[in-house]
Amino acid sequence: MFSKSLINLCRQRLYPTKVLQNVLCKRSLYERAAIGLDKYEFFREKIQNQFSEPDKQLFRERMNSFADPESNSLIFTEDLKQIVHMAGDNETDLTLVEKMMKKYNKQNQGLRFGNFTFGPVVMRMYYHLNKPDIALKLFNDPEMDGFFNHLSSYQILMDLLFINGKFDEILTVYKSIQERQLQIAKFPKGVMMLVFAACYKLNTTESFEYACKLWSDQQEAGHSPIRKTITFFAANAINQNSPHIALEVITSVRNQSYVTLRNIKVVALCDLGRIFDALPLLRSVLSVDQPMSGGPVIKQTYCRDVINLVKSAAEKHDDKELSLELDRILNQLEELNMISETTLDSLLCSEIKMVERLDTNNRESVVGASYQSGRPFKKREFRRPGITDLL
């Protein structure tokens, strides 16, 4: 079985060079709406307009007094909601928020008043202010035990760490989630995607072997990762000179016509010295574009950096017929505008977008949700632009 022998396969390095450009760029894996930042910023602006500066200052002074551990005053839900949507990018406000959260969490342990879930909202505040270090510190603070125990909180924190290049910290957060033994799925799809993205960006032997172990664990548990997780793992395998693993991994996706999958497959084949097998893939997109899954027509493109790798692989073969056929295919791709200047790395790291649909199910699994109520709401699904992400 492939999964059981995967870690051994990871050690079979076939080539000494990297084949993908692993560019570090400050971008998130979720669009703002997908993690609820749009709603957070809406209410933030609403509060900013609702209160005058003197009123805000008076509120801060009162809350600073109430948050004192020696004070008998309580921090109520509305108090904390207001400061979380009011806090600015300064030490005074951030310290006040921290003090209020700790007191609120302590006074409510064992008995929750109301049904407002603060963890995701607080993480959105830190995301908005771009404070990954503070967010991580509070996440690990024993005084905040139970405060961030929500799937949404983990995903927002990990995405914040991702855009700031803190990939090791993402793996640390995931290990912490495992140790807490929370009542959530063993392999949450969104969390696993961020973990495999971090391993891809780290691009080290250790992180790749860790990714291999996680992949094997998921396969043995019967878990089906989302396509974005699969492509991160496959690209990581290519960068770690294991294109044979990349080819095996992407076969788990039923529809092989997605842009990222085709590009990765071509790179892997070239890296294995099987450029003759890559030519039919390049040639296949020259036919008339067909709608995918009943949706709109999707132009089947190849990345410029992938095409350059194909050219380099062809030169190593020194085969005249191969060169002529490749030139013919590439000329047609150019004429049809089917070679994109977008890099494969950019495709891999493109944002997951939100698609809304009416639903009345529980909101706990929704990244953008803040309340735990039974009233109808628009459930958010996370998809790549125009195509379904879940397999």
Describe the function of each predicted region.
Residues 1-391:
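A basic, Ser/Thr-enriched alpha-helical scaffold prevalent
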